[in-house]
């Protein structure tokens, strides 16, 4: 899967990994020949990555709602990042960054933004539908992956529409990146971490406002 240039590049990057990483595959076991082929390529890719660093290993296969897919995990950590498909093409950089960040390499963002991500409350399950030729998709994928590293309440799966065509068609997705949150259409187009966080804050503020409006009236409301 990796040519000599990519292998050399990735090996150099993996030297910056500080913590152990386990790549956990969820292989496809059905009758779709295309998915079976991509599942085999996924297994090959994971093995090639693990061979480049003693801090990276391939775990036992597990079931998942999307196959083929794989999770990038850190033992003892709740970090939840998954690629459903092969993150090559424009998404190879997303894969490299995810490996580094799950492996303990610092997320490169403004400290105020990092602190704000860490302060996000509640569980948030994001899914980004992307394609390997999409130029705007990596910005979204990388932002949500980094947020999932920074905050265990945030979970992210990047879905390659070319692999999971049935899911894309069922949702009527016509353009990528398409972002879903907790199963609902949440946004589309290029968004960086700050824009995603701003949108999350707006949703949280609206939810709190609606919750307050549904409560019984207060005799006295003390603010401060």
Predicted segment positions?
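Thiol-based oxidoreductase modules, predominantly thioredoxin-like and allied folds used
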Residues: 52-64, 152-166
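Non-catalytic, surface beta->alpha helical segment in thiol-disulfide oxidoreductase systems
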Residues: 72-106, 180-210
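Local sequence-structure signature of Cys/Sec-based thiol-disulfide redox active-site neighborhoods
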Residues: 3-46, 117-158, 220
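General detector of folded, globular domains
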Residues: 45-49, 69, 141-149, 153-158, ...
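N-terminal leader/targeting and pre-domain segments
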Residues: 1-19, 91-122, 205
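Beta1/beta-strand and adjacent pyrophosphate-binding region of the FAD-binding site
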Residues: 211-224
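N-terminal non-catalytic structural scaffold regions of very large proteins
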Residues: 37-90, 105-109, 113
């Amino acid at each position: 899967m990796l040519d000599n240039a990519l292998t050399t590049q990735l090996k150099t990057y993996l030297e910056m990994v500080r913590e152990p990483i386990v790549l956990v595959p969820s292989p496809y076991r059905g009758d779709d020949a295309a998915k079976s082929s991509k599942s085999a390529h996924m297994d090959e890719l994971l093995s090639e990555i693990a061979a480049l660093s003693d801090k990276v290993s391939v775990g036992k296969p597990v079931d998942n709602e999307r196959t083929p897919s794989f999770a990038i995990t850190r033992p003892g950590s709740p970090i939840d990042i998954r690629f459903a498909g092969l993150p090559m093409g424009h998404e190879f950089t997303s894969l490299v960054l995810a490996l580094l960040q799950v492996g303990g390499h610092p997320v490169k963002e403004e400290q105020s933004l990092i602190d704000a991500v860490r302060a996000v409350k509640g569980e948030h399950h994001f899914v980004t539908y992307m394609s390997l030729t999409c130029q705007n998709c990596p910005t979204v994928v990388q932002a949500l992956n980094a947020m999932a590293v920074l905050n265990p309440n945030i979970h992210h799966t990047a879905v390659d529409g070319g692999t999971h065509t049935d899911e894309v068609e069922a949702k009527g997705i016509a353009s990528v990146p398409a972002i879903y949150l907790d199963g609902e259409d949440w946004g589309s187009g290029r968004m960086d971490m700050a824009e995603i966080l701003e949108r999350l804050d707006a949703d949280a503020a609206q939810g709190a406002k609606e919750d307050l409006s549904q409560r019984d009236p207060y005799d006295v409301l003390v603010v401060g």
